[in-house]
A protein has these predicted regions:
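GIY-YIG nuclease catalytic motif and its immediate N-terminal context
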Residues: 1-56, 60-87
Length: 87
């Protein structure tokens, strides 16, 4: 049986802000954000693109990382975006 993966992701919104969340199915969650069925924040601010994602083995790990990323400053999230592009 395949083990479930958990993803922490960062989206860039139309107004330049970032949205951070976690999910078990990244593609499905991105589709729901883009279709306006995602979080209220992304419904109001629009989604431009996925700029960062990380994979975790447990829900707890993903939730801890999500909290860490949400606490990052805007410039620190910009660095995450830059680092993702260089990998």
């Amino acid at each position: 049986m395949k083990s479930k993966s958990y993803y922490v992701y960062v989206l860039r919104c139309e107004d330049g802000s970032f949205y951070t969340g976690y999910t078990t199915c990244l593609e499905k969650r991105l589709d729901s954000h883009r279709a306006g069925r995602g979080a209220r924040y992304t419904q109001q601010h629009g989604v431009v693109r996925l700029v960062h994602s990380e994979t975790f083995a447990t829900r707890g790990e993903a939730m801890r990382r999500e909290r860490q990323v949400k606490r990052l400053s805007h410039s620190e999230k910009e660095k995450l975006q830059s680092r993702q592009g260089n990998e």
